[in-house]
Amino acid sequence: MIKRDIEIQRNIVEKSLMVIKDFIKAHRRLTLSIIISGMIAFIAVIIGIVYYEKRENAEIIQYERILDKYHGSRDINEAEKAALLKNAVNDINKLMDSSYWGFVHRNGYYTIAGMYYSQKMYKEAKEYFLKFAYRQPSSFFAPLAIQKSAVCSEYLQQYDESLKLYQRLERDYLDSPLTEQIYYDLGRMYQQRNDIFKAREYYNKIITGFPKSVFVKKTRDRMFFLGYSDKKEK
């Protein structure tokens, strides 16, 4: 029985090969065209990969030179620092405009935002953090960019905007590594608005859901003042 099965399978394979062989004989030109087209497509893919890697490497080298020039200047006055920052931002933007993929294209806005943030230029930093989050919503850094833009809004005393951004994080990125941070920041925002019920709700989420979080101590301290404020009002 086993031998018969093997023979049947062998016959099927042989018949299939014969069909292919007959097709090739009957359609030599078509077969040749298919083979040539396949080879051309394969070569095109290889060339594309090589070009992609070469261009991305060239862009990264250029990007690193821009950052080295910006960070490498020491003992300069504030006007010179501002000029260096402006030039670096312009150069990164130009590099991004000329690229359609790769590290620089994906992360340029985040780099610019960080440069502005480190100089306490919160309006500009917020703009670029949000640009990055809009362009790369699936990036690991997208929730961090939105969180930073919310902090920038706080520095700019745009508290309603801050709350909206933290709520956006809760809606879209609650499964990110920033979950405890999101709850803590929302608690802070509601505490600032004297919404004790909502503030306590978010603080409790940290204490019950993340008992080993680095935010627990800060949360307990804030809840203590919440209780004090509540008693004071009564």
Task: For the regions a language model picked out, list residue spans one by one.
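Acidic, polar-rich low-complexity tracts and alpha-helical solenoid repeat scaffolds
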Residues: M1-K234
